[in-house]
Amino acid sequence: MRAFIFFLFMLLAMFSASSTQISNTSVFKLEENPKPALILEEKNEANHLGGQRDSNKQGGSYTQGNPGTFRLQGQPGYFNKLEKPRHFKQGRAGVLNQPGILKNSGKSNQKGNPESSNKQENSGSSSQLGRPGISTQQGNPGSSDQQEKPGSFSQKVMVGSSSQQGKPGSSSQHGNLGSSTQKGNLGSSSLQGHLGLSSHQGKPESSGQQGKPGSSSQQGNLGTSGQQEKPGSSSQQGKPGLSSHQGKPGSSSQQGNLHLSSQQGNQGPSSKQRKPGSSSRQGNL
């Protein structure tokens, strides 16, 4: 009996000793854990302060963050995209930098040098900007009639050139000094007197010009008479002193023949006449 009690006492003593060791180790671990946490916080503070110091040293505009983030530095006259550090996409002066795809689809917002853009007007010229369904026309001295139909493009006329007309789906038009360039048919891109098309150009003292359906542009110089084209064809252009332009319903301009459109051949601003579905016309000397 005494041996059994002694044995139980020994087991109890061993159990208590083991429990005290476990508690001591746990307390020891709890005491050691806060130190690394403090060290980590100090490191984070050091990194944060270092980043602020780096950002304060630079003179440009930076966004400071952890490693792997982007830094943006803007320079005057350049367009910078989001890139990694030391990698910048810089545009040249006077050149249009467009990130990605144009969001303004259907609008002709273009910027460039006079030599590299067909939609930049020079001094003394008349520029036209066409948006879908809208025809905006502006004529300067030296140019005659100008017209375009809904859904057409932008037009540019320089000094001495005459009217320009585009049909839906066609592209831009550009006239040089003393000449007139017209192009564009339904559903096609820019057409400018290529082979296989009906491109007519009249020289001085020449007679009228007529385009059939699907033909491209027509151009007349000083001293030419009326110009006529049937529905489905493109624009007609004359120089100062030519007659007026008239459009029929659903077609482009028609000019210069009886039973089709009116004619007016006096110098000065030519007449403006619109029928349902046709485009407006404006002529100045």
Curated annotation (Swiss-Prot):
Residues 115-128, 160-173, 186-220 have a biased composition (Low complexity). Residues 1-20 form the signal peptide. GO terms for cellular component: endoplasmic reticulum lumen. Residues 57-67, 105-114, 134-145, 174-185, 221-285 have a biased composition (Polar residues). Residues 47-77, 91-285 are annotated as: Disordered. It comes from the Eukaryota. Keywords: Glycoprotein, Signal. PANTHER family: COLLAGEN ALPHA-1(XXIII) CHAIN-LIKE ISOFORM X2, SI:CH211-266K2.1. This is MARCO-like protein. It comes from Homo sapiens. The lineage of its organism: Eukaryota, Metazoa, Chordata, Craniata, Vertebrata.
